[in-house]
A protein has these predicted regions:
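Membrane-interface alpha-helices at helix entry/exit sites of multi-pass transporters
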Residues: 40-48, 73-74, 171-182
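Hydrophobic, membrane-facing alpha-helical anchors
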Residues: 1-4, 8, 51-62, 157-167, ...
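Short, structured loop/turn "capping" segments at alpha-beta junctions
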Residues: 124-125, 156-161, 172-176
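A small-residue-rich subset of transmembrane alpha-helices
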Residues: 52, 180-197, 206-219
Length: 256
């Protein structure tokens, strides 16, 4: 039991810090750890990870929103298209072998981390506001469709995809990008978790609750810190966290 608690603690810690700082999906960290150390069925592990994502993302989104780092309007547009296509992607993924799914998102986490360290996102809120609302709405819709399908297919909350697209394609400032990403992820992860449990049955309750609690705790700590940090510090910290988590999770995949 102590071993299980420790696995859940570190899985929750990695996932929570990743969520609070970078809007990363808990699925990227929790799933591989539960599969590697507790020998859990991959589909169930993703279900637990997604449900851990829900509260962690919600508390992070609340923290970012309170600090005015959240674009609700375009977030909602993107969310609707993400949700619709997550279902499509999820169905397609149930027809594909499970190993191909996780590795892609982990590798992407690692590359994105390097990007933040080498080429930080230094966009300001003023620059963001120059884009016309109509153009931004259309961009949000199209990007949402792409993200949704890929999320559903890979079984990750798509935090990394959203962060990449919000900062690179839509030109968001980093804090607003993370805030908007965790806001959307609250809903995508909820939908994903419900559909996973509906298809795969209920998970191991102890592991499920432990992962949710630890992820929530660390996400709150990370989000509070991230909102106080300067853009430069935040870029570097986010980059380092993503690179470290990417390497750790890739190591688990190799162990497996």
């Amino acid at each position: 039991m102590i071993f299980t608690i420790l696995v859940c603690f570190f899985a929750g810690m990695g996932a929570g810090i990743g969520t609070g700082f970078a809007g990363m999906s808990a699925a990227a960290v929790i799933s591989p750890m539960l599969i590697t150390f507790l020998g859990m069925d991959p589909y169930m592990a993703v279900g637990i990870a997604l449900s851990s994502d829900v509260l962690a993302s919600a508390v992070s989104a609340y923290t970012y929103g309170k600090n005015k780092n959240l674009d609700v309007k375009n977030g909602l547009i993107m969310m609707v298209s993400v949700l619709a296509f997550t279902v499509v992607g999820s169905y397609v993924s149930s027809l594909v072998p499970s190993t191909t799914m996780g590795n892609f998102s982990v590798f992407m986490t690692f590359l994105l981390g390097i990007k933040f360290i080498v080429k930080p996102v230094m966009t300001t809120k003023e620059a963001m506001e120059k884009v016309s609302p109509k153009k931004r709405a259309v961009q949000s819709l199209i990007c949402g469709v792409m993200i949704g399908f890929i999320c559903g297919f890979i079984g990750a909350g798509g935090g990394m995809m959203m962060l990449l697209i919000l900062t690179s394609v839509l030109g968001y400032e980093l804090k607003t990008a993370v805030g908007t990403s965790v806001f959307i992820m609250t809903f995508t992860a909820f939908t994903g978790a419900v559909s996973h449990f509906a298809i795969g049955g209920m998970p191991n309750i102890a592991v499920w609750i432990l992962c949710i609690v630890f992820t929530l705790l660390w996400a709150r700590i990370a989000a509070v810190f991230a909102n106080k940090a300067t853009p430069k510090t935040l870029n570097r910290t986010t980059g380092v966290i993503l690179v470290v988590l990417g390497i750790v999770v890739m190591a688990f995949s190799i162990l497996n």
